[in-house]
Amino acid sequence: MNLLIFGATGDTGRELVKQALAQGHTVTAFSRHADELTADFPTIKTIEGDVTDKATVEKAVQGQDAVLSALGSSSLKRSPALTTGVRNIVEAMEQYNVRRLVYQSSLGVGESRKQVGFLVRYIIIPLVLRNAIADHEDKERIIKQSNLDWVIVRPAGLTNGDHTGEYRSGETIDFGAKIARADVADFMLKQVTDDACLKKTPGVSY
């Protein structure tokens, strides 16, 4: 399949690229620094650009079979540019009839907030993570209001552990659970062809 990956130079994005190529997919990586990937992945196609540039996003989306997004920000401030980027991705996919979108969000967003413990729910999220959570909620809203075949993945606490292929997924994730980015990528790639979680927001953890 022709897969387009946004946020491909991030930790989860690189895992998506590596595993997608290993599975035989034709991968296009979209990133502001996409050239960083060519040394490690010589067969990859790259598009260097910013997701806020609608024309570049549209060009990238054309001809793809599915889109995966690992877009994220390390800042604790609001990131309206990423929300604009997700809107551009969704609109381009609708325009060019690319149906499947798999988006990485986070545990604690939306109704999954009730799954986290008291400290995280009432202190850490309101005081520390409120902007990051609000950004994810804005982006999820855009995706859910679209006519795409979407899956929003909400991983537990992320680690840089090994790719095991063994994890739990579903609507309920235990507070304090962890999962390696490599296994998040594994789960996300499965959603490209699996309809079980279509238009759902599964959590994923060990």
Each language-model region and where it sits:
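Conserved beta-loop-beta element that borders a ligand/cofactor-binding pocket
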Residues: 140-161
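N-terminal Rossmann NAD(P)H-binding glycine-rich loop of SDR-like oxidoreductase domains
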Residues: 3-23
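Conserved Rossmann-fold cofactor-binding substructure of NAD(P)-dependent oxidoreductases
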Residues: 42-64
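Glycine/proline-rich active-site loop of Rossmann-fold NAD(P)-dependent oxidoreductases
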Residues: 111, 162-165, 191-200
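NAD(P)-cofactor binding segment of oxidoreductase domains
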Residues: 74-101, 138
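N-terminal Rossmann-like NAD(P) cofactor-binding module of classical short-chain dehydrogenase/reductase
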Residues: 61, 65-68, 102
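N-terminal Rossmann-fold cofactor-binding loop
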Residues: 30-35, 50-51
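Substrate-positioning beta->alpha
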Residues: 135, 153, 179-189, 200
